[in-house]
Amino acid sequence: XDEAAPPPAATAPXAAXTE
């Protein structure tokens, strides 16, 4: 069910850049 609830990083790639 990963597709049902993907990680926040996948939804907001920009967040990864911020980290």
From Swiss-Prot:
Membrane topology: Peripheral membrane protein
Chief location bin: plastid
Protein localization: Plastid, Chloroplast thylakoid membrane
Coiled-coil stretches noted in the UniProt entry, renumbered to this chain: none
Keywords assigned by UniProt, alphabetized: Chloroplast, Membrane, Photosynthesis, Photosystem I, Plastid, Thylakoid
Keyword Cell inner membrane: no
Family: Belongs to the PsaE family.
Function description: Stabilizes the interaction between PsaC and the PSI core, assists the docking of the ferredoxin to PSI and interacts with ferredoxin-NADP oxidoreductase.
Protein's name according to its UniProt entry: Photosystem I reaction center subunit IV
Organism of origin: Cucumis sativus
